[in-house]
Amino acid sequence: MTRMVHCIKLDKEAEALDFPPYPGELGKRIYESVSKEAWAAWLKHQTMLVNENRLNLADVRARKYLATQMEKHFFGEGADAAQGYVPPTE
């Protein structure tokens, strides 16, 4: 049977993650209260942040920035918008 959580981001019952996606206490909090759907949305946003801000993930500061943004995205006031991103028009 699939594990379900009340997703803190989507504010609905949804399929839970299979394992903590990040180490430490933050990963545990995400595992317990974030759905697969919300995690997938974060991964897309994280990719935009990395690309638009030209982050080097070998740099400790870039990884700390992304961890802070991830915490804000799920448990705070929301992550930064990707600078320079223009949504596609139809």
UniProtKB/Swiss-Prot annotation:
Pfam name, any one: Iron_traffic
Gene3D superfamilies assigned: Fe(II) trafficking protein YggX
SUPFAM superfamilies: YggX-like
Highest taxon in the source lineage: Bacteria
Keyword entries, A-Z: Iron
One annotated Gene Ontology cellular component of this protein: cytosol
GO molecular function: iron ion binding
Biological process per Gene Ontology, one example term: cellular response to oxidative stress
Function recorded in the entry: Could be a mediator in iron transactions between iron acquisition and iron-requiring processes, such as synthesis and/or repair of Fe-S clusters in biosynthetic enzymes.
Assigned protein family: Belongs to the Fe(2+)-trafficking protein family.
The protein, known as: Probable Fe(2+)-trafficking protein
Source organism (scientific name): Herminiimonas arsenicoxydans
